[in-house]
From Swiss-Prot:
Catalytic activity field: phosphate(out) + ATP + H2O = ADP + 2 phosphate(in) + H(+)
Organism of provenance: Ralstonia nicotianae (strain ATCC BAA-1114 / GMI1000)
Binding positions for ATP per the UniProt entry: 49-56
Domain ABC transporter: 17-258
Purpose of the protein: Part of the ABC transporter complex PstSACB involved in phosphate import. Responsible for energy coupling to the transport system.
Family that this chain belongs to: Belongs to the ABC transporter superfamily. Phosphate importer (TC 3.A.1.7) family.
Assembly and interaction partners: The complex is composed of two ATP-binding proteins (PstB), two transmembrane proteins (PstC and PstA) and a solute-binding protein (PstS).
Protein name stated in the entry: Phosphate import ATP-binding protein PstB
BP term (GO), one: phosphate ion transmembrane transport
InterPro entries named among the record's database cross-references: AAA+_ATPase (IPR003593), ABC_transporter-like_ATP-bd (IPR003439), ABC_transporter-like_CS (IPR017871), P-loop_NTPase (IPR027417), PstB-like (IPR005670)
Lineage: Bacteria, Pseudomonadati, Pseudomonadota, Betaproteobacteria, Burkholderiales
Record's keyword terms, sorted: ATP-binding, Cell inner membrane, Cell membrane, Membrane, Nucleotide-binding, Phosphate transport, Translocase, Transport
Amino acid sequence: MTMTATSIDVRVQSPKIDVRDLNFYYGKFHALKNISLQIPEKQVTAFIGPSGCGKSTLLRTFNKMYALYPEQRAEGEINMDGENLLTSRMDIALLRAKVGMVFQKPTPFPMSIYDNIAFGVKLFERLSRSEMDDRVEWALTKAALWGEVKDKLHQSGYGLSGGQQQRLCIARGIAIRPEVLLLDEPCSALDPISTGKIEELIAELKDDYTVVIVTHNMQQAARCSDYTAYMYLGELIEFGETEKIFIKPRRKETEDYITGRFG
């Protein structure tokens, strides 16, 4: 399958993140190639594409997860609120507070449900006990988990089901009140019922947050997102409103992937 590079010129009304000519390298391997797109504010944007296409790599550039590894580097611009995150001197912990992340596998901390939520908050704010109690309840309620755990807040997060653990991780992420929430295949390890709850939660979260989700599940992208980006071999092939991408894609490569003729 031969593809040629294309210019993606889709302007969104209120971009929260503006990516321009982004290139990313794992050592000498060129993983992302001249990516340019705008992530709309308080909308859900989905990244789709086959394994190894670069969608998770792109997601992780938004909060500089690659900074943990010296051999990895990004070039270009990722602008948020008028500041290029790639050259910004913003404290990395502060950046990750503004741009939260939930990973593919639920990763609760080895502590109580309450402390899972309170831990990150304590890094950035000094709250009284009653204020912290309110924040914990608020975050767990936002993550549609409060009703299930309110009577066992001091039990280990490890005692929750997989779907509950993932919602706990989402609650932990929003407890520090980020502006952007990154979800890297958050439902891939979950059963259909838990997946449905996460999808309902995503729909509610966009009222307050800019949400970006990586998913292998095209039906999930169609259900959950407002905008969709299709990637292949480190290139952005097509980006636009989800309904248009799935009903009338502009690129044959996108149509082939969505219809299952390629993938």
